[in-house]
Amino acid sequence: MSLKIYNTLTGKKEDFAPIKPGEVKIYTCGVTVYDYNHVGHGRSLIVFDMIRRYLRYLGYNVIFVRNFTDVDDKIINRAKNECLPFSVISDKFIKEYFDDAEKFRIEPADIEPRVTTHIPDIINFIQKLVDAGYAYEADGDVYFSVRKFKEYGKLSKRSIDELLAGARIEPGEKKKDPLDFALWKSAKAGEPYWESPWGKGRPGWHTECCAMIFKHLGETIDIHGGGLDLTFPHHENEIAQAEALTGKPFARYWIHNGLVTVNGQKMSKSLGNYIKLKEIYSKYEPDILRLLVLSVHYRSPLDFSWDKMEETKKAYERLKNAIEEAEVLNKLPIDENFEGDLYNAIQKAQSGFYSAMSDDFNTPEALASLFGLVREMNILRDKAIKHGGISKKAIESYKEAAKTLHDIGRDIFGLFDSLQPCIKQEEVKVKEKEESINEDLIQVLIEAREKARKEKQFTIADLIRDKLAEKGIILEDAPFGTKWKKA
């Protein structure tokens, strides 16, 4: 089944075909590091982490770049208010970003460029636009001449006339046309600056990403992503610069995730509904937010509320319990007269999952397939308990179902990182009662139990102890380790 992706540029789903077979180059616009990350940032991070993981699952070598905007008006203003160098502010919030990303198991990008370490590349990029006649200097500022790029507006589906109606030249700006945008800003008193052919200054936001993409990924990439709010003007302006310079498509596929509201309202500090990621993981396991984000299609709006977090927590517990409950069945007597297994349900769930994911990363439908498997697992478990026994085939099928849930959740959705998929046979399997148990195996099981206890997997630890007791081996926990003796 081929992967289909909704392309913002064309407004339709398209078969995914990377430029180089087997390789995918992705760039997503990162955060401007002037404040703590909020739930909107979290959604974008989780969405593109999921996309990256699924592409990798499909066998692609994914080269993923996400930048940091570490010099900007907001950073400079905060630095002034706190009487600190701008770099102290940006360094602080880059560290906060990495802390949040680690908590939510966002895989680090392969390359994470910072604007301030790419100033020569940005200046060189701007100079090429000036030389090509698409940009002009005006008293130390450099602007892009929008009307010279005839396809301007093709991403956001806006015409020049529409844009002109709301455009104006701000006091102090020296651009020739209200539509033109800044590539280089001349230095102001008390602000950071770099030397350039046009004098002291700093780069404009829209040109930074272009220069970093050209440096690290080339002139045409496979996927460019970001939040829906970046479609215009940021991504529109990126296309104009890059394609004016090369005459080639800048990105084959443009992917934008929907925005986040809070209780139906736009998130803002003035409304008091600005939800930081720190606040979320102080109250919930990070997996809960990941699951909430994935329960809504990435292109749809996501309305965040604490009530929805509670609902999602309950759904997460259903998944988690299904994965962990293999030991319940292990405690039942073996009865080969028990009928039923989960192999067909596993196949159906896998097929449904990958079909949904290959249809523009339809995570709600993919999750529905997983919860369908959970339902079948619960039915089998309840039937076996009522029956008072279970066949070996049924137990193994349950373990396989638990492993399927765990591995898909971990590898593609970034869930269950510390969860045991099921009881590993090599950790808990003991010989039949009539056979003796050797000391090497006892020691292996003691070590496995100790590991489970350290990871707070107490159910598994207790099961190992009980299984050894069935063999006549009694464990005695002491401050300096666990000892054993025969009953």
Curated annotation (Swiss-Prot):
EC number(s) recorded for this UniProt protein: 6.1.1.16
Annotated compartments: Cytoplasm
Protein name: Cysteine--tRNA ligase
Family recorded in the similarity comment: Belongs to the class-I aminoacyl-tRNA synthetase family.
Chain span(s) of sequence motif 'KMSKS' region: 266-270
Primary location class: cytoplasm
Residues given in the record as Zn(2+) binding sites: C29, C209, H234, E238
A biological process term (GO) from this entry: cysteinyl-tRNA aminoacylation
GO molecular function: ATP binding; cysteine-tRNA ligase activity; zinc ion binding
Disulfide bond entries: none
GO cellular component terms given for this protein: cytosol
InterPro entries: Cys-tRNA-ligase (IPR015803), Cys-tRNA-synt_Ia_DALR (IPR015273), Cys-tRNA/MSH_ligase (IPR024909), Rossmann-like_a/b/a_fold (IPR014729), tRNA-synt_1_cat_dom (IPR032678), tRNAsynth_Ia_anticodon-bd (IPR009080)
Gene that encodes the chain: cysS
